[in-house]
């Protein structure tokens, strides 16, 4: 079913529910946490390209009163360490870089499920660097995650480069196929730009998917800038069921330009050792953009010619 979202101020809502499911504003965490289970579903530690230790992340999450999902790139040490703590609500997760360069978030009910998935299906296909693409295709990652009862979410589906699923590397048919396999899309990414988050929101509604939000934080100042919340118990299984059942709400605001620059500069230390992989992916993405642009020009010419033929045919018919 296609849902056409309406906009009211900074909020999107559907005609199915009166309450707003996507709100673009800084979360009032103290109010939200009094009524809902609130989680920042996208955060990185120093086990991949984040700046902070798990201890620092836990301390900040506890101060904000929210749950946290450490979703390091191609690594689970941070999520496993966080799961050992009893003072912070956390959801075990990982952000995997597929062979094609796009990212996939996967969440699990238990840390043991995450470990089993990682050791059995992901680790054998990892690259030499934590930020290097693994050798698994998007479809393979999703299928393996489902085998372990994981919840699959596509982060930042629209973004500047190839890391989102909605990019020219994938054909329209393949994008639709991948989206149909997933449980949700990240409609608010705190590190993204607003217009792409808007497109991601419309995508989530139109595909009738679960909606999530996360800061995509690499430093503590980003935590809680975008959150997902649900009326459920503070248990990973209950929260993930809410995503599956499309019973989550999202709220967040993108961080400012200077903070984006600060966050990006902090990631350089891990990306510096991954230049060859990044170069290859950027080359493929550039070629895909050129091909996509050529295809659009070609389609436009064909449409123009078809319209002209239709006009000529109509004129001939009128003369007769």
What kind of feature is each model-predicted range?
Residues 73-74, 95, 157, 217:
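Short, ordered loop/turn segments at secondary-structure junctions
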Residues 124-170:
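Divalent metal-binding pocket/active-site signature
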Residues 1-39, 45-59, 64, 79-92, ...:
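Charged catalytic cores and adjacent phosphate/nucleic-acid-binding surfaces used
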Residues 112-130:
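Active-site neighborhood of divalent metal-dependent phosphoester bond hydrolases
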Residues 43-47, 149-152:
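Short, conserved structural micro-motifs that define repeat-unit consensus positions
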Residues 45-46, 68-75:
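Ser/Thr-glycine-rich phosphate-binding loops at phosphate-binding pockets of nucleotides
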Residues 96-97, 125:
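Active-site PLP-lysine loop of aminotransferase-like
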